[in-house]
């Protein structure tokens, strides 16, 4: 997890650990915000769609995603990451759901990255410089799966 952020889930009024959630340890030499921003990029999403089962985001996949040190140290990515995470928080919705099948009440936060696309695009534009993408490659990344990602649910 980035910056020791933890998902908070209440089940029947009791705080519970989310079993599927795994922690990502980041070396102190790296900036947590920039790593979080890069993992929130469309570039990372495209790689996730292209190279995984599209269901399980594994620690191994994250560990093997190539991130240039220059991108981790880029102040623009750090600033865009801070703006992105603040926007995620501003747009989140807390849900309180009763599951009849289990008889349990669950409270959780839902996040809507499509509402923060301007920040994600800015991160991808900066990343394109670090990965030496052409304009066409950057355009492909920014617009990848756009209809699905930005459409109404």
Explain the meaning of each model-derived region:
Residues 1-153:
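S-adenosyl-L-methionine
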């Amino acid at each position: 997890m980035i910056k020791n952020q933890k998902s908070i889930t209440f089940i029947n009024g009791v705080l519970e650990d989310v079993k599927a959630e795994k922690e990502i340890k980041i070396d102190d030499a790296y900036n947590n915000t920039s790593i979080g921003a890069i993992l929130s990029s469309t570039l990372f999403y495209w790689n996730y769609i292209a190279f995984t089962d599209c269901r399980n985001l594994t620690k191994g996949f994250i560990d093997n995603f190539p991130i240039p040190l220059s991108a981790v140290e880029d102040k623009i990515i750090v600033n865009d990451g801070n703006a992105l995470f603040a926007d995620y928080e501003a747009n989140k919705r807390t849900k309180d759901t009763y599951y009849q099948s289990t008889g349990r009440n669950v409270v959780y936060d839902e996040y809507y990255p499509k509402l923060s696309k301007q920040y994600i695009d800015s991160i991808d534009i900066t990343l394109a410089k670090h990965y030496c993408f052409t304009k066409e490659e950057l355009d492909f990344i920014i617009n990848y799966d756009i209809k699905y990602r930005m459409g109404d649910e």
